[in-house]
């Protein structure tokens, strides 16, 4: 059951800590850029990392092909939980041909047989339920967070495991109005807003939309004021420590006549706040799936698509 996988998230963080990383020193001067390839639940790892790391350029590749700049100075990380993701395998093969330093995070499959530096993670999960296993090796390798920051994150996640009534109430409100979730983030939580969107898609089996401040003020502002059937959407916005973003959130609500459900990140460290928000969204979507009486782990349509195009 997905709930049990949710509750394993904090244990993933405690288990992985900073001892799980790729081989090599990865000193800043030894590479020019980082490319992280991954799709779906595996692809979120690169998106999360890209908002936490800025010492070198980070490119998230969710395609068959890699960017032209990839060369021998590129640290290329292929992330595929199954090890058989078509797009990621194609990208990894191209990276090898271009002489990049290629690494992999996977539970097995063809990716584990490519002969590259590989971190093997436990199997038997849905990729989206293995976000800790998929993300922490990258964070540990390039950022090396403090032990106490990871412990803080694990503790906050454990608290959510014990009490997720707030998340259940949000799910109930969404279901009661048969509303479409809209999730607004801002740096460094843009990828988390996208993660929420995909969790609503896969877990609760409903459409959802995500965007981020302040970019959304250059496009979403007009429809927020003038669109039809606005009452069919459920708007949520992550709070920000940036006063300019906070002001934008408040002014956007006032001039468009829209109310946002404010979601506040907890934790003193960035890694704690990011993983807290991820876990928060996981529970909202789990509860919505339960209320809708749908199996949150069912991905039969996705598997059918893969079979038909293979």
From Swiss-Prot:
InterPro entries: Glu6P/Mann6P_isomerase_C (IPR019490), SIS_dom (IPR001347), SIS_dom_sf (IPR046348), SIS_PGI/PMI_1 (IPR035484)
Gene3D superfamilies hit by this protein: Glucose-6-phosphate isomerase like protein, domain 1
Binding site for D-fructose 6-phosphate: 41-42, 80, 82, 85, 128, 218, 306
CDD domains reported in the protein's UniProt record: SIS_PGI_PMI_1, SIS_PGI_PMI_2
Annotated keywords: Carbohydrate metabolism, Isomerase
Coiled coil spans: none
Subunit-structure text: Homodimer.
UniProt protein name: Bifunctional phosphoglucose/phosphomannose isomerase
């Amino acid at each position: 059951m997905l709930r049990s996988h949710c509750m394993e998230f904090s244990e993933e963080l405690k288990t992985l800590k900073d001892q799980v990383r790729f081989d090599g020193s990865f000193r800043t001067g030894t590479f020019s850029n980082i490319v992280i390839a991954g799709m779906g639940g595996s692809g979120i790892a690169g998106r999360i990392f890209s908002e936490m790391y800025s010492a070198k350029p980070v490119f998230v590749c969710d395609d068959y092909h890699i960017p032209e700049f990839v060369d021998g100075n590129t640290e290329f990380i292929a992330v595929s939980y199954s090890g058989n993701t078509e797009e990621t395998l194609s990208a990894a093969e191209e990276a090898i041909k271009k002489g990049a330093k290629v690494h992999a995070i996977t539970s097995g499959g063809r990716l584990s047989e490519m002969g590259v530096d590989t971190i093997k993670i436990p199997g038997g999960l849905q990729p989206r339920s293995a976000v800790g296993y998929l993300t922490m090796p990258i964070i540990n390798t390039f950022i090396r967070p403090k032990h106490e920051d990871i412990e803080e994150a694990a503790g906050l996640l454990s608290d959510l495991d014990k009490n997720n009534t707030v998340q259940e109430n949000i799910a109930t409100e969404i279901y009661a109005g048969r509303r479409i979730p809209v999730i607004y983030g801002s740096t460094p939580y843009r990828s988390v807003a996208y993660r929420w969107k995909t969790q609503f898609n896969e877990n609760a089996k409903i459409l959802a939309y995500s965007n981020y401040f302040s970019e959304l003020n250059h496009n979403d502002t007009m429809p927020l004021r003038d669109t039809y059937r606005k009452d069919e959407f459920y708007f949520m916005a992550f709070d920000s420590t940036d006063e300019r973003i906070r002001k934008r959130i408040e002014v956007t609500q006032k001039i468009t006549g829209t109310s946002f459900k404010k979601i506040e990140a907890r934790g003193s460290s960035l890694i704690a706040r990011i993983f807290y928000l991820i876990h928060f969204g996981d529970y909202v979507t789990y509860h919505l799936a339960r209320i809708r009486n749908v199996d949150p782990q069912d991905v039969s349509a996705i598997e059918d698509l893969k079979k038909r195009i293979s």
